[in-house]
């Protein structure tokens, strides 16, 4: 394992994720934001966390949470611990396998996706509001949050909800130069040989 490669990934990702999370919090807390209308309880949770701990602390912990989740999911994908890859594309593809399957109407039963999640993902992919890229990002976000919720049952320390983290999930995860793309590239099969890559 190349510890310098992983260390560089962690330092670069931390700054990028902090900026992304801070921007998402600002957008979510705007008066009349879609999140305020659709998820008022989580929005209030987020506001309470900021009031209790301060904005910097919430940004830092949320960025840290998402970095750890994405790295853990990459490790689990490489090691075959997920029924289908959650953050990793299949060979020759560009989208994570879970999203490619969902676009075909296939939802692995091992993830236990609720009817509501499946319907929302299919509705968004079939032509909900926004551009094609935005719809794809929104559908992937739904899947990613549902997977984290599922794994939270067994690993709450890693995938449990913290300060409404699902509400401020980093955007642009499917972009070529995204933090997720860097994680997938830098945490290759060789790097994932040992669980130390997560430490």
Name each model feature, range by range.
Residues 1-199:
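Preference for the N-terminal adenyl/adenosyl cofactor-binding alpha/beta module
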């Amino acid at each position: 394992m190349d510890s310098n490669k992983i260390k560089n990934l962690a330092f670069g990702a931390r700054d990028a994720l902090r900026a992304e999370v801070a921007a998402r919090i600002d957008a979510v807390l705007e008066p009349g934001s879609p999140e305020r209308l659709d998820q008022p309880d989580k929005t209030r949770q987020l506001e309470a966390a900021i009031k209790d701990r301060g904005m910097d602390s919430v940004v830092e912990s949320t960025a840290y949470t998402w970095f750890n989740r994405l790295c853990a999911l990459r490790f689990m994908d490489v090691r075959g611990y997920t029924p289908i890859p959650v953050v990793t594309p299949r060979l020759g593809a560009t989208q994570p396998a879970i999203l490619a399957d969902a676009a075909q109407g296939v939802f692995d039963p091992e993830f236990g996706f609720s009817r509501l999640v499946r319907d929302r993902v299919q509705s968004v992919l079939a032509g909900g509001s926004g551009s094609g890229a935005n719809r794809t990002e929104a559908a992937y976000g739904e899947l990613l949050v549902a997977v984290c919720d599922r794994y939270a049952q067994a690993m709450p320390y890693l995938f449990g909800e913290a300060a409404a983290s699902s509400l401020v999930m980093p955007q642009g995860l499917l972009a070529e130069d995204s933090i997720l793309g860097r994680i997938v590239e830098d945490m290759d099969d060789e790097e994932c040989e040992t669980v130390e890559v997560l430490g």
